[in-house]
A protein has these predicted regions:
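Glycine-centered loop/turn positions within well-structured domains
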Residues: 128
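Non-catalytic, conserved peripheral segments adjacent to functional cores
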Residues: 14-119, 135-170
Length: 170
């Protein structure tokens, strides 16, 4: 747990952000989620999830590209390695399991969905994949420090031959 203090207009705001630093410096950050309210009768009408604020200091590589990808039920994106790019992922709709293979060959499984939002940082040269473990199309928000260009050959497809992806399929 880290506390960040911000002083602005005589206001001191302390926010505790839970950051799990994993092997090879990939990180899992539990994101803030706040209910939103109707302006007239104040009933709850949804929620707001904070993915990133410049003063949080949770993103160490400035994003140059932000995109949303979809993953159909039971389908897998990856596994692959980005040789230059650092990526930050958050499941914004549906259910996704992020599988990260550290440099010692150990697999780490991070479940993410919009009810319990997380931001997963996968640094360059670390293998990862994500699979939709739910019954509806999932959407993943990605922040990347290098913008994608056609034919840049920055991504290497690999296989997780010693990992059972089928356990997440329904």
């Amino acid at each position: 747990m880290y506390q960040f203090g911000i002083i602005s207009s005589k206001l001191l705001l302390l926010k505790t952000i839970e950051i799990q630093i994993m092997p090879d410096d990939f990180t899992v950050i539990n994101l803030e989620k706040h209910p939103t309210k109707d302006i007239l009768d104040k009933h709850e009408n949804g929620s707001l999830t904070v993915v990133w604020r410049d003063w949080d200091q949770i993103i160490s590589h400035e994003p140059k590209m932000v995109y949303v990808s979809s993953v159909f039920p039971g389908e897998i994106k990856g596994p692959h390695i980005h040789t230059k790019r650092n990526s930050y992922f958050s499941c914004i709709h549906g259910n996704v399991v992020f599988i990260v293979k550290d440099k010692q060959g150990n697999y780490h499984e991070i479940k993410s969905n919009s009810d319990e939002p997380k931001l997963i940082h996968v640094p360059n040269m670390v293998a990862s994949a994500h699979i939709n473990s739910g019954n509806e199309t999932a959407r993943v928000l990605t922040l990347a420090d290098i913008a994608w260009k056609p034919n840049d050959n920055e991504m290497q497809n690999i296989t997780f031959d010693d990992y059972d992806m089928d356990k997440w399929r329904k």
